């Protein structure tokens, strides 16, 4: 078995997925993981892989990694409705990324001013089982958010 260490994609405080005020994430319909109440301004790649999906509005991205591991990083809740307000894509879809590669700029104040939650789920939607989850404060590209065993 291999262990994939998924780093925090943005500075902030870990929130258990079950406490996310969105049923799709709270009930793990999109996959297991955790969420972050972000304090940072840039979302980075949490693992090495290919940026297989980068939404034009910048509110979410997906990475395909080794061992069929797939991650979804969703910045805020219902933020697709903002049509890019509060987000700026830095990376490009199809690009290879390493942990810490900047992907999206995030304006927390603007997203909140537009009436959206900034709670940001990070979920594993591919192979493997999450074995350890962080709690407390995490730093983007530095601290392990969770571990996936594949």
Question: Where do the PLM segments sit?
Answer:
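Contiguous, well-folded functional domains in the mature portion of proteins
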Residues: 1-150
């Amino acid at each position: 078995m291999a262990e994939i260490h998924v780093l925090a994609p943005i500075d902030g405080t870990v929130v258990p997925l079950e406490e996310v005020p969105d049923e799709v994430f709270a009930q793990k319909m999109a996959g297991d993981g955790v969420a972050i109440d972000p304090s940072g301004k840039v979302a980075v790649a949490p693992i090495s892989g290919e940026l297989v999906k980068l939404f034009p509005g910048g509110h979410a991205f997906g990475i395909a990694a080794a061992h069929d591991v797939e991650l979804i990083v969703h910045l805020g809740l219902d933020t697709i409705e903002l049509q890019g307000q509060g987000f700026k894509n830095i990376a490009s879809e199809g690009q290879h990324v390493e942990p810490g590669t900047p992907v999206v700029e995030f304006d927390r104040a603007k997203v909140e001013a537009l009436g959206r939650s900034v709670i940001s789920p990070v979920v594993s939607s591919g192979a493997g089982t999450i074995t350890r989850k962080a709690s407390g404060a995490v730093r983007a590209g530095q601290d392990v958010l969770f571990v996936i065993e594949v």
